[in-house]
């Protein structure tokens, strides 16, 4: 594929991916410092903030990706040269990068302001939780063809683990950072996220033919 096609296609997909939900999530994260005092926070308190609140960032920014095709976007112009899989993965990865940077910015400020915790395990673990919740919501949105279904599915998983403390989800427990500074179960959640996005990427062309 020539550079003349790649550049405008990348810009177009960037414009599609950067949704108003990004602005909403940024505003919500920016408001967090108003309600906390980092000097008084230990590792467990920061973990609760990340796992219970910041992780919902993923549910805000991911599900709409499952409905981008419903608006009749202009990728048909490149249909003979561009496969859908890399485009969908580009959008998902771009959103994952946004989540990681947003989480890193917030926790870097909290850490620098006096909170006592290991920074990067907290950033990575919280970002993975946000991404897997969002990917679950994205998958439900795609399968149901309805944005509300995505929000309900993602939040249902969140609520299930919040109330049962992982008794029903086992190694796929979302909030492992509450137990230790780094939970190896996060790697399973990261793998599940990749599995879900690959499923979505392969399923979406079928849905477009329905």
What kind of feature is each model-predicted range?
Residues 111-117, 174-181, 196-200:
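Short alpha-helical linear motifs
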Residues 1-9, 84-85, 115, 131-132:
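Juxtamembrane loop-helix boundary motifs flanking transmembrane segments in multi-pass membrane proteins
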Residues 147-191:
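Transmembrane helix segments
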Residues 76-84:
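Short helix-to-coil transition segments within interhelical loops
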Residues 65-76, 139-143, 169-179:
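A cytosolic-side transmembrane-helix exit/cap motif
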Residues 1-51, 56-67, 139-142, 165-166, ...:
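Hydrophobic alpha-helical transmembrane segments
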Residues 34-68, 89-154:
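Secretory targeting signals
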């Amino acid at each position: 594929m020539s550079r003349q096609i790649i550049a405008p296609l990348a810009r177009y997909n960037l414009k599609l991916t950067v949704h108003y939900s990004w602005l909403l999530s940024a505003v919500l994260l920016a408001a967090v410092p108003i309600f906390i005092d980092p000097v008084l926070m230990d590792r467990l308190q920061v973990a609760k903030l990340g796992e219970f609140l910041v992780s919902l960032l993923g549910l805000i920014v991911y599900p709409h990706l499952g409905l981008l095709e419903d608006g009749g976007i202009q990728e048909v112009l490149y249909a003979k040269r561009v496969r859908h899989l890399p485009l969908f993965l580009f959008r998902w990865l771009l959103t994952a990068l946004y989540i990681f940077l947003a989480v890193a910015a917030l926790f870097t400020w909290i850490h620098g302001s006096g909170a006592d915790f290991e920074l990067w395990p907290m950033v990575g673990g919280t970002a993975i939780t946000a991404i897997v919740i969002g990917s679950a919501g994205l998958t439900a949105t795609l399968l149901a063809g309805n944005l509300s279904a995505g929000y309900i599915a993602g939040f249902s998983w969140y609520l299930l683990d919040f109330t049962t403390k992982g008794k029903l989800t086992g190694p796929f427990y979302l909030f492992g950072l509450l137990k230790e500074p780094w939970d190896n179960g996060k790697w399973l959640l990261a793998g599940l996220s990749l599995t879900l996005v690959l499923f979505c990427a392969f399923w979406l062309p079928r849905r477009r033919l329905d």
